[in-house]
UniProtKB/Swiss-Prot annotation:
CDD domains: S4. Keywords: Ribonucleoprotein, Ribosomal protein, RNA-binding, rRNA-binding. The lineage of its organism: Bacteria, Pseudomonadati, Pseudomonadota, Alphaproteobacteria, Hyphomicrobiales. Residues 1-16 have a biased composition (Basic and acidic residues). Transmembrane segments: none annotated. Signal peptide: none annotated. It comes from Parvibaculum lavamentivorans (strain DS-1 / DSM 13023 / NCIMB 13966). Residues 1-46 are annotated as: Disordered. InterPro entries: Ribosomal_uS4, Ribosomal_uS4_bac-type, Ribosomal_uS4_CS, Ribosomal_uS4_N, S4_RNA-bd, S4_RNA-bd_sf. PROSITE patterns: RIBOSOMAL_S4, S4. HAMAP family: Ribosomal_uS4_B. Part of the 30S ribosomal subunit. Contacts protein S5. The interaction surface between S4 and S5 is involved in control of translational fidelity. This is Small ribosomal subunit protein uS4.
């Protein structure tokens, strides 16, 4: 297992869940968190602890977004009219790195962030290298022609894990995706149980 994978799987171990549904996740073999202290019996969490855990899990799923950036997304969701938890999920799923991951151009959110950052993705024919770039309904996202033979792309193209949510249309052969619509929380295929309502409660305390 590479250092990058070890760092990534710390989130799984800390949460005690297989966040991304990956077959190599260490929690498939362990029942405790990272480090020797992870083996101690866990006590019942306070309401704050439950909310914090929900926030850490959702933030971790999207490649462990920085706290500053994640709080900013919450604040934007809170300003908009409607169900704040639904809006939060919609904003997260509109991130370009999230769409690249959902389209299965690469295998993980971490790889998607790096892939976008290195300029391998076009949006409506123009190169975009900002992982947090927000896509709109109807946007076409594709892998640059020169990037289609990269090992990270070939690994994903040969994987059996090619299912994509119905709010993204994907041509896997051409490596082109279309963002059809902003999803509701119930549309998003999380491998682990997510509770965005608790995330809202967490930030509402401050």
């Amino acid at each position: 297992m590479t250092k990058r994978q070890e760092s990534k799987y710390k989130i799984d171990r800390r949460m005690g869940e297989n966040i991304w549904g990956r077959p190599k996740s260490p929690v498939n073999r362990r029942e405790y968190g990272p480090g020797q202290h992870g083996q101690r019996r866990k006590g019942k969490l306070s309401d704050y602890g439950v909310q914090l855990r929900a926030k850490q899990k959702l933030k971790g799923f999207y490649g462990n977004i920085s706290e500053k950036q994640f709080r900013g997304i919450y604040k934007e969701a809170n300003r908009l009219r409607g169900d704040t938890s639904e809006i939060l999920i919609g904003l997260l799923e509109r991130r370009l790195d999230a769409v690249v991951y959902r389209a299965k151009f690469v295998m993980t959110p971490f790889a998607a962030r790096q892939f976008v950052g290195h300029g391998h993705i076009l949006v409506n024919g123009k190169r975009v290298n900002v992982p947090s770039y927000r896509v709109r309904e109807g946007d076409v996202i594709e892998v640059r022609e020169k990037s289609k033979q990269l090992a990270i792309v070939l690994e994903a193209s040969q994987s059996a894990e090619r299912d994509t949510p119905d709010y993204i249309e994907v041509d896997h052969d051409k490596m082109v995706a279309k963002f059809v619509r902003i999803p509701a929380f119930s549309d998003v295929p999380y491998a682990a149980h997510m509770e965005p309502n608790l995330v809202i409660e967490f930030y509402s305390r401050s």
